[in-house]
Swiss-Prot record:
Enzyme Commission designation: 4.6.1.17
Family recorded in the similarity comment: Belongs to the MoaC family.
Molecular-function GO terms, alphabetical: cyclic pyranopterin monophosphate synthase activity
Gene from which this protein is expressed: moaC
Active site: 128
Protein keywords: Lyase, Molybdenum cofactor biosynthesis
Record GO biological process: Mo-molybdopterin cofactor biosynthetic process
InterPro entries assigned: MoaC, MoaC_bact/euk, MoaC_sf, MoCo_biosynth_MoaA/MoaC, Mopterin_CF_biosynth-C_dom
Organism: Cupriavidus necator (strain ATCC 17699 / DSM 428 / KCTC 22496 / NCIMB 10442 / H16 / Stanier 337)
The protein's name in its UniProt record: Cyclic pyranopterin monophosphate synthase
Length: 159
């Protein structure tokens, strides 16, 4: 099993030194869902929620969150992102909105945390904008789908 990298030999947390790592093109893709009542889904789909364009605001929130990840996750390196793409898929049959965030950089460390943070904040934004009509929404299935680049190479989730 690989050793945890964020702890020194005394068990103290530290930020990993990436100074000697090569700068490479790095990509990460993460996803997650929020499930809601059908009436809430209709408001989101039709853009008629009281607070405005839920999907549009969630997209901007995701992009903003990716850029602030190092401020939220204590041992995460600040990264100069070169691209952030946010996509939403609406499934009327299950009243579910899926969010997928793709992050890219050319740097010394990966962008997985940025993609995951973007997804979470997008889904939290949807919850915030719709909670007045549906407090029972469920956020779930948040996961990394793939990462590319760096010393550890490529990884794609099974399934």
């Amino acid at each position: 099993m690989t050793q945890l990298t964020h702890f020194d030999t005394a068990g103290q947390a530290h930020m990993v030194d990436v100074g000697d790592k090569a700068s490479t093109h790095r990509v990460a893709v993460a996803t997650g869902t929020i499930t809601m009542q059908p009436a809430t889904f209709t408001l989101v789909r039709d853009g008629s929620a009281k607070k405005g364009d839920v999907i549009g605001i969630a997209r901007v929130a995701a992009i903003m969150a990716t850029k602030r990840t190092a401020d939220l996750i204590p041992l995460c390196h600040p990264i100069g992102l070169t691209k952030v793409a946010v996509e939403f898929a609406l499934d009327e049959a299950t009243a579910t909105v899926a969010c997928t965030v793709r992050t890219e950089t050319r740097g010394q460390t990966g962008v997985e945390m940025e993609a995951l943070t973007g997804v979470q904040v997008a889904l939290l934004t949807i919850y915030d904008m719709c909670k007045a009509v549906d407090r029972g929404m469920v956020i779930g299935n948040v996961k990394l789908l793939e990462k590319h680049g760096g010393k550890s190479g490529d990884w794609v989730a099974a399934g």
